[in-house]
């Protein structure tokens, strides 16, 4: 190699998009956060918590990896469900490569088999990522990996426990090596392409999931209405939680406002950690009839409105 060769030519940068595909609750959002090293996407035990495409951005060596956390793929019933599943598959087709996640405990169940069948139409290189390996015996993991590779021609197979971080570094390095040559698309210190207003709304939505255990969270959405930087270095945030019926509004508020206070306290603490400054969070709960059938709400969530 010539001594006068510029460093950027000696080590050309790489950059590409990686779509994470899998059934609900296989751990896609947890894996994105583990790969990035920071929380960029909502995590909950409840299914269907990721609604739109959220991108986490990782720099590993000379490569920038743009991770696309897609909604979980399942059999859609409602209009919102159809939009989420359609968005997930569009993310797979548009990416440079695909990471297919399997839950080690569930294995190749009916949902996974349906995803594998549709994956045959996706021509990009594919990695198989078996998650939650700490919960399953080694023999079962090896058998699952063999069965999956007999179904789909995966370039590589990885065993990870996203929650603890086990195996995540190996996956990150392999993704970096697989990225095509090209310039970085984002600043090196940027961890997500989602604006802070959106991340703050996602955090509050996560706290709704954690504080309420009925079907209600799937019939609610959060919008950041106001974000004001204060002279004392703090930030004042106003958010509205929209529900479809007045009975749902009462559930979110809770007896004596206890539930909304708990949601607000949890959300405020986490938003403050992300923005690195004190946060004054004000939550309002409003009824918006049939918001799940409003095209404008879909655009706000980054989803395409299904016509049928």
UniProtKB/Swiss-Prot annotation:
Alphabetized GO MF terms: GTP binding; GTPase activity; ribosomal small subunit binding; small ribosomal subunit rRNA binding
Assembly and interaction partners: Monomer.
Annotated GTP binding sites: 22-29, 69-73, 131-134
Membrane topology value: Peripheral membrane protein
Chain segments carrying region G3: 69-72
Region (G4): 131-134
Protein name per UniProt: GTPase Era
Keywords per UniProt: Cell inner membrane, Cell membrane, Cytoplasm, GTP-binding, Membrane, Nucleotide-binding, Ribosome biogenesis, RNA-binding, rRNA-binding
Family: Belongs to the TRAFAC class TrmE-Era-EngA-EngB-Septin-like GTPase superfamily. Era GTPase family.
One GO location term (cellular component): plasma membrane
Subcellular location field: Cytoplasm; Cell inner membrane
Residues covered by the Era-type G domain: 14-181
């Amino acid at each position: 190699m010539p001594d006068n060769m510029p460093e950027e030519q000696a080590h050309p940068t790489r950059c590409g998009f990686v779509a994470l595909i899998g059934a609900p609750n296989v751990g896609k959002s947890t894996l994105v956060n583990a790969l990035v090293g920071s929380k960029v996407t909502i995590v909950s035990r409840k299914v269907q918590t990721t609604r739109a495409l959220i991108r986490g951005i990782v720099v590993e060596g000379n490569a920038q990896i743009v991770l696309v956390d897609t909604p979980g793929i399942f059999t859609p019933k409602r209009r919102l469900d159809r939009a989420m599943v359609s968005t997930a598959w569009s993310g797979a087709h548009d990416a440079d490569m695909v990471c297919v996640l399997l839950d080690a405990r569930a294995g190749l169940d009916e949902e996974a088999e349906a995803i594998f069948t549709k994956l045959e139409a996706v021509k990009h290189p594919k990695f198989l990522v078996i998650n939650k390996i700490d919960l399953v015996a080694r023999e079962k993991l090896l058998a699952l990996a063999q069965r999956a590779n007999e179904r789909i021609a995966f370039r590589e197979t990885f065993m990870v426990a996203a929650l603890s971080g086990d195996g995540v570094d190996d996956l990150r390095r392999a993704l970096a090596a697989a990225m095509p040559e090209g310039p970085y698309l984002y600043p090196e210190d940027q961890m997500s392409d989602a604006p802070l207003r959106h991340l703050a709304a996602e955090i509050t939505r996560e706290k709704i999931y954690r504080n309420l255990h009925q079907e209600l969270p799937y019939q609610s959405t959060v919008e950041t209405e106001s974000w004001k930087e204060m002279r004392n270095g703090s930030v004042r945030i106003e958010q509205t939680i929209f529900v479809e019926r007045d009975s749902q509004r009462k559930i979110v508020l809770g007896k004596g406002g206890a539930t909304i206070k708990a949601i607000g306290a949890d959300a405020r603490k986490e938003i403050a950690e992300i923005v690195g400054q004190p946060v004054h969070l004000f939550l309002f709960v409003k009824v918006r009839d049939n918001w799940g059938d409003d095209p404008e709400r879909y655009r706000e969530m980054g989803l395409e409105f299904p016509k049928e």
